[in-house]
């Protein structure tokens, strides 16, 4: 929270986090939880990154709009983000979809998820709204984006970054002039336009927007009254402002929080099983691109009380050990070996098992003599002794969710089918 006193714009801002999406490309990982509630990095949830960025930037009013399978997300927020104090002009509101506009409709789109809570926003009377997606992994100082918004007199400032053109179909794609004013904006185009001079790159929206509050609320009311609108920021609100107002692009490089000047700008969508696996496994690198050890920019989360990780047995073939791995509190590695793997809280790995390039979510239990490679194991899954995954693609695909890149997702329901 190093920015708290020195962030003149963030002190007058409210962060509004959109956290209602399912994230269907994560397959069974989001059968029972929203994408922002998916575990990441050993002890966090994906939403903790947007929330921590807001807190570390100096923002002290935060609202989170939830909808799909919200129970685990709400429980996490109540446990881990309950330290805001009204007497210090701080607030943290959880806003489930509650059919405030019509008894027949939940949130109809991202813009509607804000419109339905206009009264709550007005009650706090913030000067700025920082609108955030709750399902991306990155570290960013929103104060710098707010500063650009004010200096350029923008109606909306849109966070953006360069991505390979082939990947841009999943994002809003923009063109800018030499002053960073957005002159065109296409939401998820089938054929994304390239950046001038960079035929293989597109400039895309990060789903991060800064508005002055009055302007935003006026736009939301206008959009809500339009029967032809889908009530979505990327499809409706932003293109309208690009055409009729002043929309400005804020390049992520300008506000990315890095641990050194040589570090790259790190932002991940983690919207597929492959991307989710890769982003977690990347953390086992000697110097990962995402620095979770930056004490000046911590990733806040709910800290479950657990004993330290434990490694037991020291015999040839039955040695509890881990190489290039992250092992969280409460884990017990009993005569098993780990390589390039990430274990969340309370995982148990039994003797003679070998685990490589694998992400294991909380309280999973890996039985004796298992061999696992390139796997994601969902929370509380109990693997039977002798299970082998990652060596026979056809056999894996019959039993588990196997991606095109060869990553296997294992859930409790899949294991129960093996026993049936």
Curated annotation (Swiss-Prot):
Task of the protein: Involved in the biosynthesis of ADP-glucose, a building block required for the elongation reactions to produce glycogen. Catalyzes the reaction between ATP and alpha-D-glucose 1-phosphate (G1P) to produce pyrophosphate and ADP-Glc.
Summary of subunit composition and partner proteins: Homotetramer.
InterPro entries with a match to the protein in the record: ADP-Glc_PPase, ADP_Glu_pyroP_CS, GlgC_bac, GlmU/GlgC-like_hexapep, NTP_transferase_dom, Nucleotide-diphossugar_trans, Trimer_LpxA-like_sf
One BP annotation, GO: glycogen biosynthetic process
Gene behind the chain: glgC
Protein name: Glucose-1-phosphate adenylyltransferase
UniProt entry tagged with the keyword Nucleotide-binding: yes
Source organism, top-level taxon: Bacteria
Binding site for alpha-D-glucose 1-phosphate: 107, 172, 187-188, 205
């Amino acid at each position: 929270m190093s920015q708290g006193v020195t962030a003149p714009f963030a002190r007058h801002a409210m962060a509004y986090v959109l956290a209602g999406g399912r994230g269907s490309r994560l397959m069974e990982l989001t059968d029972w939880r929203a994408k922002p509630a998916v575990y990441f990095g050993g002890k966090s949830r994906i939403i903790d990154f947007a929330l921590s960025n807001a807190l570390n930037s100096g923002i002290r009013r935060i609202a989170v709009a939830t909808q799909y399978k919200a129970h685990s997300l709400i429980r996490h927020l109540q446990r881990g983000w309950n330290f805001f104090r009204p007497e210090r002009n701080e607030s943290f509101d959880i806003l489930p979809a509650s059919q405030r506009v019509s008894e027949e409709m939940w949130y109809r789109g991202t813009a509607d998820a804000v419109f339905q809570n206009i009264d709550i926003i007005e009650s706090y009377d913030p000067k700025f709204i920082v609108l955030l997606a709750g399902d991306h992994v990155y570290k960013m100082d929103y104060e710098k984006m707010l500063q650009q918004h004010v200096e350029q007199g923008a109606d909306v400032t849109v966070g953006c970054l360069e991505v390979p053109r082939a990947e841009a179909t999943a994002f809003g794609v923009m063109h800018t002039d030499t002053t960073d004013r957005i002159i065109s904006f296409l939401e998820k185009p089938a054929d994304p336009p390239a950046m001038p001079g960079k035929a293989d790159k597109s400039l895309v929206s990060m789903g991060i927007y800064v508005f002055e509050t009055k302007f935003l609320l006026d736009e939301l009311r206008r959009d809500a009254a339009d029967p032809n609108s889908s009530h979505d920021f990327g499809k409706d609100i932003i293109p309208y402002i690009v055409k009729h107002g002043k929309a400005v692009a804020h390049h992520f490089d300008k506000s990315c929080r890095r641990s050194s000047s040589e570090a790259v700008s790190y932002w991940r969508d983690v919207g597929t099983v492959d991307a989710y696996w890769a982003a977690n496994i990347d953390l086992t690198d000697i110097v990962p691109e995402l620095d979770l050890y930056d004490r000046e920019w911590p990733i806040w989360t709910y800290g479950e009380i657990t004993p330290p990780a434990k490694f037991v047995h020291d015999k040839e073939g039955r040695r509890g050990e881990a190489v290039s791995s992250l092992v969280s509190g409460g884990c017990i590695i009993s005569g098993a070996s780990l390589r390039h793997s990430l274990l969340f809280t309370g995982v148990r790995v039994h003797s003679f098992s070998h685990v490589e390039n694998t992400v294991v979510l909380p309280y999973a239990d890996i039985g004796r003599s298992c061999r696992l490679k390139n796997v994601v194991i969902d929370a509380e899954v109990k693997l039977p002794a002798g299970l082998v995954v990652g060596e026979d693609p056809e056999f894996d695909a019959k039993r588990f969710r196997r991606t095109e890149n060869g990553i296997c997702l294992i859930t409790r329901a899949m294991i129960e089918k093996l026993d049936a």
